[in-house]
């Protein structure tokens, strides 16, 4: 049986996941996910991050295991390349530049744009066909193609709505989240101390700005998806040697049953004692190191 990836307190601390925003910028709806504050910066309760990450990774695993499609979304600069890298690694879909309004709710229009992109691609790759165009016309076609690729490269093989949306910054991607909610698409999202966790089925409290944090999240998400893919292929009797080829092409389109919503661990009693101790000790060690540096 495939093993769903997991994460511990130390890995999250090393990636800076515990650093929230300045206390003046917080969203009160995140109160239950905040451990405290240090130097006017909110500290995220990593005990809950560990527990809720596990729930989110299981949701990703189960979605792909059942041949579902996952759409990764983050258009912020520091996450753009990382999102694309890990979505491609696990054969899923992504939007990493501008979210076009209606990408989910007005799919017919988006599908038309994808068709236009594919036609431009086909024309520009056909040397014989290009002989009928002027250099200026070819240049204009290339520019149109590049513009479409920025928004559509990660979804050009997506033929229907995704079964799960994975978001890094809920504030920046609020339009994508609203569209997913309208279509009843479950949402996994990293929620920082200035985020609104409403409408997020699988919240993961954590820093959504740090490149190290974002890379850690995406690595875990991709690993969970790959484990789900492996289970799906085994169940279908697919040759595991074809794993890489299958991943490169993306997953087939099948309906997936609605995933159960994640339980929100808003109280520390829901977290095991070992994780409690590990987190508190790690914070104490960090304070001691800071004090010794200032001595």
UniProtKB/Swiss-Prot annotation:
Give me the ranges of the annotated region Disordered. 247-295
Q: Give GO cellular component annotations, separated by semicolons.
A: small ribosomal subunit
The answer to keyword DNA repair applying to this record is: no
A GO molecular function annotation here is: structural constituent of ribosome
Q: Which residues form a coiled coil?
A: none
* GO BP: any one term: translation
Q: Which keywords has UniProt assigned to this entry?
A: Ribonucleoprotein, Ribosomal protein
Instruction: Supply the SUPFAM superfamilies for this chain.
Output: Ribosomal protein S2
Q: Does the keyword ATP-binding apply?
A: no
Q: What is this protein called?
A: Small ribosomal subunit protein uS2
Among Pfam families, the record links this protein to: Ribosomal_S2
Similarity-based family = Belongs to the universal ribosomal protein uS2 family.
Origin species:
Rickettsia africae (strain ESF-5)
- Could you tell me which InterPro entries the record lists for this protein? Ribosomal_uS2 (IPR001865), Ribosomal_uS2_bac/mit/plastid (IPR005706), Ribosomal_uS2_CS (IPR018130), Ribosomal_uS2_flav_dom_sf (IPR023591)
């Amino acid at each position: 049986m495939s093993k769903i990836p997991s994460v511990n307190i130390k890995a999250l601390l090393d990636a800076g996941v515990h650093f929230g925003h300045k206390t003046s910028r917080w969203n009160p709806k995140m109160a239950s996910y905040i451990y405290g504050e240090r130097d006017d910066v909110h500290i995220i309760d990593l005990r809950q991050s560990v527990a809720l990450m596990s729930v989110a990774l299981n949701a990703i695993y189960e979605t792909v295991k059942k041949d579902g499609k996952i759409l990764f979304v983050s258009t912020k600069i520091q996450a753009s390349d990382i999102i694309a890298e890990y979505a491609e690694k696990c054969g899923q879909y992504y939007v990493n530049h501008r979210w076009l309004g209606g990408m989910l709710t007005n799919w017919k229009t988006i599908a038309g744009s994808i068709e236009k992109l594919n036609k431009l691609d086909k024309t520009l790759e056909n040397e014989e066909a290009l002989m009928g165009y002027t250099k200026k016309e070819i240049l204009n076609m290339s520019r149109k193609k590049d513009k479409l690729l920025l928004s559509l490269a990660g979804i050009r093989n997506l033929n229907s709505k995704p079964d799960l949306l994975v978001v890094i910054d809920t504030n920046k991607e609020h339009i994508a989240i609203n569209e997913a909610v309208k279509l009843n698409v479950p949402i996994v999202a990293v929620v920082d101390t200035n985020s609104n966790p409403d409408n997020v089925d699988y919240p993961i409290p954590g820093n959504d700005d740090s490149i190290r944090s974002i890379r850690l999240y995406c690595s875990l998400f991709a690993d969970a998806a790959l484990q789900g893919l492996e289970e799906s292929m085994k169940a279908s009797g697919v040759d595991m040697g074809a794993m890489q080829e299958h991943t490169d092409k993306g997953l087939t389109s099948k309906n997936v049953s609605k995933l159960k919503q994640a339980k929100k661990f808003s109280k520390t009693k829901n977290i095991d004692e070992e994780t409690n101790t590990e987190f508190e000790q790690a914070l104490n060690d960090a304070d001691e190191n800071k004090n010794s540096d200032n001595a």
